[in-house]
């Protein structure tokens, strides 16, 4: 019947399905990415999702399951506390905007194992959680306490356009600062899953943005991809 909806969206769970293309997904950001939404549209989404719980759990039992800490609270949504204010202050000082907070689903914990940490999730191309970073915002002895799961993933895959040049950088804050097509390595080496994705996606140009103390690592990465027919450009800071 012509009354059947062409696009169905559950704003409570974020799940969507297009009856024309028979495609579906787990969250609204994935849908926005598919239709080529601009940054302005992502900002507008911010005004709509105030009370929508975001996708937080990967229920795929065939792989290692990544879960956000149970104490995780989104920074873009409701509530106020001194800890939340300090978390936001830390992010603003590092150049992270409200749009970034919404786009990357950034949250925080004020209790538990990840207490006083900003939580930055990473989602795969299907919108499933594949890793998260926990950064202490009171500058305690242990700066980072990350997901206990493997780093052998593609960081921020949900936001990557593989038809364009990509940027490889060390951390999530670097990746967010670049604003466009940047993949955090969660370190100084390119893991197998990311290597494979880059080769299979036929990426033509890689911009390598490692810290100055990582010359040896950068050279190894560069040689590997050049040997695979990919142009590599070093970025200096």
Where in this protein do the model-derived segments appear?
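Acidic beta-strand-to-loop metal/phosphate-binding motif
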Residues: 168, 204-213, 217
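A residue-level signal for conserved active-site and pocket-lining positions in enzyme catalytic cores
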Residues: 18, 91, 127, 208
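A generic structural motif
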Residues: 46, 231-237
């Amino acid at each position: 019947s012509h009354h059947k909806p062409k696009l169905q969206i559950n704003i409570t769970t974020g799940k969507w399905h297009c009856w024309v293309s028979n495609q579906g997904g787990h969250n609204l950001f994935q849908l926005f990415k598919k239709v080529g939404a601009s940054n302005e549209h992502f900002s507008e989404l911010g005004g709509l999702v105030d009370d929508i719980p975001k996708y937080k759990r990967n229920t795929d039992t065939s792989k290692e399951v990544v879960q956000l800490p149970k104490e995780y609270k989104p920074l873009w949504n409701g509530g106020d506390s001194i800890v939340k204010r300090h978390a936001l202050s830390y992010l603003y000082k590092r150049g992270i905007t409200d749009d970034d907070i919404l786009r990357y689903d950034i949250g925080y914990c004020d209790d538990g194992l990840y207490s006083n940490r900003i939580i930055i999730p990473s989602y795969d191309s299907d919108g499933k959680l594949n890793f998260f970073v926990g950064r202490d915002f009171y500058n305690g002895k242990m700066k980072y306490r990350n997901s206990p799961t493997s780093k052998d993933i593609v960081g921020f895959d949900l936001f990557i356009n593989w038809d364009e040049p990509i940027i490889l950088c060390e951390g999530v804050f670097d990746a967010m600062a670049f604003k466009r097509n940047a993949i955090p390595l969660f370190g100084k080496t390119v893991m197998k899953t990311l290597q494979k994705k880059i080769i299979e996606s036929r990426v033509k140009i890689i911009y390598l943005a490692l810290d100055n103390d990582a010359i040896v690592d950068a050279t190894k990465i560069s040689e590997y991809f050049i040997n695979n027919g990919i142009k590599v450009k070093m970025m200096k800071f």
